Amino acid sequence: MEPLELEGFLNLLKPPGMTSHDVVAKARRLLKEKRIGHLGTLDPDAAGVLPIAIGQATRLIELVAGVDKAYRTQLRLGAVTDSQDASGRIVKTGAVPALSRDDWEETLRPFRGQILQTPPMVSAVSVGGKRLYEYARQGIEVERSARPVSISRIEIVHYDPATPEEIVIDVECSAGTYIRTLCHDIGQRLGCGGHMGWLIRTRSGLFSLRDSLTLESLAEGPPKEQIVTPFEALAHLPALEIGENRLAALSRGLAQYLQGDGWSEGQWIRMHRRQKLLAVGQAIRKDEQWLCQPRKVFTRLETRSK
């Protein structure tokens, strides 16, 4: 494959058995582009949507990665593991209760909305300058603070009373939600313990499973028609169109006036010209006027892949 001039986002399908870093490394080789990063780690055993940023779009990862996610997962009841998933060692077992659909609705209700969740030991959260998974490898458990996360939807997809220990659920949640911890906490609520069996990420923001590309298809040829432009990838942000007479000022990093009062301090805004992203900025209040202060100004973005 010849070197490509691509900038934007690709929606890749991560297979189980590969790390997210492995997927990025392979994409770099296939696309012959060093500037590639992923938008949110998936565990090696997990599969599903793993969007990648290419070229200058890597500067936007933090703004695109912080969107809501959706997952399908298997909850296995009756066993607690030290990793909260099927790869861990079973540390406790319990009898699985027989539950009706109404019972399940009552069980899941407290997990909807904003909840507090304690990060698992096998996570990349830093405590005392070290990642939690580094402590876990040494057999050390450290105290962690609970964090607020939001779950907008949690529904049962499959439940068979003949095999009550295995339940498939769909979850839509905020970035930073640990599905393995959700499975563990549901098991704790039922009193029998539980852990995550398998996990598929079905959506990350506007990137969905049905539109994802396999690494095999990526190897077959240039995926230019599959590129999601930075302007499109930031669709969750308000847009400010820049007039022709303000382009020079924007290139020098000068603030642009905002219309109206429906802004909040620090709010991110995509700054564009005819839906070509020029910069991203933040709303600031100055002299009773709202302005958009550019934070990241781009050159050639969204033009090379055309």
From Swiss-Prot:
Its EC number is 5.4.99.25. Responsible for synthesis of pseudouridine from uracil-55 in the psi GC loop of transfer RNAs. NCBIfam families: TruB. The keyword Lipoprotein does not apply. Pfam families: TruB_C_2, TruB_N. The active site is at D43 (nucleophile). This is tRNA pseudouridine synthase B. Belongs to the pseudouridine synthase TruB family. Type 1 subfamily. It comes from the Bacteria. Disulfide bonds: none annotated. Keywords: Isomerase, tRNA processing. GO terms for biological process: mRNA pseudouridine synthesis; tRNA pseudouridine synthesis. It catalyses: uridine(55) in tRNA = pseudouridine(55) in tRNA. GO terms for molecular function: RNA binding; tRNA pseudouridine(55) synthase activity.
